[in-house]
Amino acid sequence: MEPFAKALEIVARVMRDGAATHPDNDWVQRGPEYHLGRAEEHLRLRRDGDQLQDHVSHAATRLLMALTLRELG
């Protein structure tokens, strides 16, 4: 876990911040494909030079959401 410790802290922060604007863990009501699409959008925005958010952190969070939902079945 050591190499990923800082990255996981950042993902946890994104989740905490998201909980303030998206109550009730509403992300679990979406399917994995939705979160994959949102991750792709964050990566596209980063490639296009957008700096309004930390798009890599948000993309990583969305990928972990998709993985979690896939594993929960």
Description of each model-found segment:
Residues 1-73:
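Intrinsically disordered, low-complexity regulatory regions
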